[in-house]
Regions:
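Long, highly hydrophobic alpha-helical transmembrane signal-anchor segments
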Residues: 1-27
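Functional transmembrane core segments of multi-pass inner-membrane proteins
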Residues: 8, 100, 106, 111-177
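Long, charge-rich boundary regions
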Residues: 60-61, 65-135
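Membrane-proximal soluble regions of multi-pass membrane proteins
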Residues: 19-74
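Functional transmembrane helices that embed catalytic/metal-coordinating motifs
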Residues: 11-20, 61, 126, 177
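Alpha-helical membrane-inserting segments
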Residues: 19, 23, 85, 89, ...
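Transmembrane helix-loop junctions in multipass membrane proteins, especially transporters and channels
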Residues: 25-33, 91-98, 124, 150-154
Length: 177
């Protein structure tokens, strides 16, 4: 296994772990930055070695270290899924219709994987899509369209079609609220 593959796998699993924190804490209106992870039942504060993505769940046999209550299998599944999508993004071919730099394409792929997994989980668990993720996804998508237009000898039609598609799509979700 190449070192970059291992690095991207670990990065993806770590981002997946953050997605788990995001999904859990945003629904409870808690900070996603401050505060340590705790067992939801006994409030035991997890040590750093209990927070290693994927690995800790298996080492703890899917149970809290203190009270032995089951920890949902969803945690390592989300971490593995995110790691898998990051690896897929790493080895996918860059977009075929532009000379966009490879690093930008990869970075955008990682960000979009994060947004798609987060929104999918929010929708599955709470039937709710947080505006701070959907709106930032919209801005990132439009920024990408603008950059692709610039790298495609500034084909303004491409950017305008992306802008109109974003407007129609976002309007659809606003109407559904």
């Amino acid at each position: 296994m190449e070192l970059k593959t291992l690095f991207i796998f670990i990065l993806g699993a770590s981002i997946g772990s953050f997605i788990n924190v995001l999904i859990y804490r945003v629904s409870l209106k808690k900070s996603i930055v401050f505060g340590s992870s705790k067992c939801p039942k006994c409030e035991y504060q997890l040590a750093w070695f209990d927070n290693i993505p994927i690995l800790s769940w298996f080492l703890l046999l899917g149970k809290c270290r203190k009270c032995k209550v089951n920890i949902s299998i969803n945690y390592p599944i989300v971490e593995l899924l995110t790691a898998f999508l990051f690896i897929l993004n790493l080895y996918s071919k860059p977009t075929f219709y532009t000379d966009t730099p490879l690093l930008w394409s990869r970075l955008l792929g990682f960000i979009l994987a994060f947004i798609c997994i987060s929104l999918s989980l929010f929708d599955l668990r709470y039937f709710w899509l947080p505006n701070f993720i959907t709106f930032n996804g919209l801005l990132i998508g439009l920024s990408n369209s603008l950059l692709l237009s610039i790298y495609s000898n500034f084909d303004l039609k491409f950017f305008l079609s992306s802008l109109s598609a974003a407007f129609i799509g976002y309007s659809f979700f606003l109407i559904l609220r």
